[in-house]
Amino acid sequence: MASREGITSGRTQKETDTTWMRFCFSIDEDAPFTRTQAQEFLADRGVSTRMVWTGNILRQPGFASIDHRSPDTGLPNCDRMMERSLSLPIHHRLNADHIGYICEQLDQMWEHYT
């Protein structure tokens, strides 16, 4: 997926030690499909997706009444993550067949929109 034009895969820094619970990726503005189209295509084929809600935490309802500081220019990179990113499931019950199916659906989605 990382090699597909219009997609930016999640990544970590060398010194980061993480446990992946979801595989996140962003759909670039020049991608042949939108986040909504990707969600609908995959959902129709039984692949669950979730929006990446952590992009701009200040846009979450729970932060509406909490005092905070933010730049006058806003947080455009955080907003972009929130608006254009999706995550795919990763958990201990997925087996090789499940992962293969998810990958096949991603390939079919790409072929459908290009």
Tell me what each language-model feature is.
Residues 1-114:
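PLP-dependent aminotransferase class I/II
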